[in-house]
From Swiss-Prot:
Source organism per UniProt: Pyrenophora teres f. teres (strain 0-1) (Barley net blotch fungus)
InterPro entries the record matches: Creatinase/aminopeptidase-like (IPR036005), Met_Aminopeptidase_Type2 (IPR050247), Pept_M24 (IPR000994), Pept_M24_MAP (IPR001714), Pept_M24A_MAP2 (IPR002468), Pept_M24A_MAP2_BS (IPR018349), WH-like_DNA-bd_sf (IPR036388), WH_DNA-bd_sf (IPR036390)
Name the UniProt record assigns to this protein: Methionine aminopeptidase 2-2
Record field: compositional bias (Basic residues): 67-79
UniProt biased composition (Basic and acidic residues): 1-12, 55-66
Record GO cellular component, one term: cytoplasm
Length: 459
């Protein structure tokens, strides 16, 4: 989920067709190898041997005196059902993995650079706070969230074909995340245990970020010539995995997608403890803008979007206080041990500068505002519901509307937004007729290595 640049930044609360047949997805090989799929082969008994080879020692004499051996009846083998993910994915990961460890992300050793770097006292304190936050369940929670993301997006990629509606795609992603985390989010506080980290973003063509379907609006259908960016987040106990990809049915956009994917991978390669953010930004832009795309007979340079950035992630907060631009910048900021970053890039065939559009993508709580300013009872009640169910997580209208008892909330929400207690987020767009692509991964800067936690076989 992109973070807007400071000059325009309104930071969050810290913040085929529908009947396409999809093959059932098997669990990861690592899970099967670790004993996840436990079952006996047909025709084997409990000792693992084939009963056909077993004979009894009982001798029977025939009339001619010859001996023959009587076969013992075969034991009927017990078949244990193999746990597999369904399509669409709805089996909770806790059931699928059955206490087995969740898969690691991509582990990358650091490149040791002798910069003779010194951290200031403030940086040391910030680093210590980040390390303290990495408790015993840190990696378990992060790897679970990442595996949920991989399995849900695998299905999303399979159905994101021309003819699918954005509403269906968003609902499949939302429902998949809830099912696999095992938290439907209907009971008070359940969505804070695990689930969606922010509204599922489905942005077409010149819409760069922060668009999601809302109830009551005209549904949008994916077309052959569309460029679709799919950006969604999964959290487990506030550990947020933020990852995004782009799909395009028309191969004319292949170079656009390749440029952005290469730029994101460059950012991931450069990321690490003590890495200078200005160096990372410059490297990203150099790779991104080395590509061109031919559209309607014209060769168009691909530009790195200037006013949206990658960002660090805090617990229950999708946007922290560090940003990673995609263009050359001046900053003394460095990445630090314990940091978690969403390394993402956006490439555009337009002006590569995004502006607010009409509509609402989502809402987020502003913790810096005192709720004592509220006097309207409906607004107070709505704020209580938001705090209890979303906390500092950004949420969409459809997430709020599915909660029991939430009705006719629009006046209360308007009051909360006008008072500054809740911030609203608009879609971000480039010029009409342009096309934007996005790729994104979450990386953990662990003490001895970096782990690209959301990496999969797809991207």
């Amino acid at each position: 989920m992109g973070s807007k640049s400071p000059e325009d930044h309104r930071q969050g609360p810290d913040g085929g067709s529908a009947d396409t047949a999809i093959a059932i997805v098997n669990p990861p090989k690592s899970a099967a190898a670790s004993g996840l799929l436990q079952g006996m082969l047909e025709g084997q008994d409990e000792d693992g041997d084939d009963d056909d080879d077993e004979k009894t020692g009982i001798d029977l004499k025939t009339n001619d005196g010859a001996k023959k051996k009587r076969k013992r009846n075969k034991k009927k083998s017990k078949k244990l059902s193999v746990v597999q993910q369904t399509s669409p994915p709805r089996v909770p990961l806790a059931t699928l993995f059955d206490n087995q460890p969740y898969p690691e992300g991509q582990i990358v050793d650091y490149n040791v650079k002798d910069d003779n770097l010194q951290r200031t006292t403030a940086e040391e304190l910030r680093h210590l706070a980040a390390v303290r936050d990495m408790d015993d369940d840190f990696l378990k929670d992060y790897r679970k969230a990442a595996e949920v993301h991989r399995q849900v997006r695998r299905y999303a990629q399979a159905i994101a074909k021309p003819g699918v509606s954005m509403t269906r795609l968003a609902e499949e992603i939302d429902d998949g995340v809830r099912a696999l985390t095992g938290h439907e989010g209907l009971e008070t506080g359940d969505a804070l245990k695990a689930g969606l980290a922010f509204p599922t973003g489905l942005c077409l063509n010149h819409v760069g970020a922060h668009w999601t379907p809302n109830a009551g609006a005209k549904d949008v259908i994916l077309k052959h010539d569309d460029v679709l960016k799919v950006d969604f987040g999964v959290h487990v106990n506030g550990r947020i995995v933020d990852s995004a990809f782009t799909v395009a049915a028309n191969p004319v956009y292949d170079n656009l997608l390749a440029a952005v994917k290469a730029a994101t991978n460059t950012g991931l390669e450069e990321a690490g403890i003590d890495a200078r953010i200005d160096h990372i930004s410059e490297a990203i832009q150099e790779v991104m803008e080395s590509y061109e795309v031919e559209l309607n007979g014209k060769t168009i340079p691909i530009k790195a979007v200037r006013n949206i950035t990658g960002h660090n992630i805090l617990r229950y907060r999708i946007h922290g206080d560090k940003q990673v631009p995609f263009v050359k910048t001046k900053t003394d900021q460095r990445m630090e041990e314990g940091d978690i970053f969403a390394i993402e890039t956006f490439g555009s065939t337009g002006k590569a500068y995004l502006q607010d559009d009409v509509g609402v993508y989502g809402y987020g709580r502003n913790e810096n505002m005192n709720p004592a300013v509220l006097h309207q009872s409906s607004a107070k009640s709505l704020l209580k519901t938001i705090d209890a169910n979303f906390g500092t997580l950004v949420f969409a209208r459809r997430q709020l509307e599915r909660l029991p008892g939430v009705e006719k909330y629009h006046l209360g929400m308007r009051t909360l937004v006008n008072s500054g207690l809740v911030e609203s987020y608009a879609p971000l767009v480039d010029i009409p007729g342009s096309y934007i692509a996005q790729f994104e991964h979450t990386v953990l800067l662990r003490p001895n290595c970096k782990e690209i936690i959301s990496r999969g076989e797809d991207y």
